[in-house]
């Protein structure tokens, strides 16, 4: 607290919030997950993400991008669809992609396939704009978004009644997540 958020310890705090988010999601507890999302935002001010040398957004922006995933995990489809895009989509490139992913899954789950397809296009376009150097732990965000692309594709295909193609896409998602 003495030196605020503008130090290396912000990374440790974000890492801890990330563990709380995913632990709560695994345990089926939305409230702790959302509190941890809020904590991540509070511990990582935008001014820190705007530091260019070293490029702090590449290290930390992904950690404030998980709320859309929490909404998907708990089937909060309408909230996911209504989730606002960040004003600065270049700075918050990971969050922007996650919002489109969550909206796409939400629309698919509600049977709104045309809207889901539009969000899939938006997701793929947002994915292309994520800097290659952006990371979450030891993973590049681009690699993780590729997992989401196949997952979203599978969700949409399933809602279109193309079950074999849907399950093939979902298997590709799992294979990408498992890694080489």
Residue spans for each PLM region:
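"A position-specific structural signal for the A-helix of alpha-solenoid helical repeats
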Residues: 19, 66, 98, 102, ...
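Solenoid-like repeat scaffolds
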Residues: 2-7, 41-57, 83-94, 124-142, ...
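Generic long, charged, amphipathic alpha-helical segments
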Residues: 148, 163-180
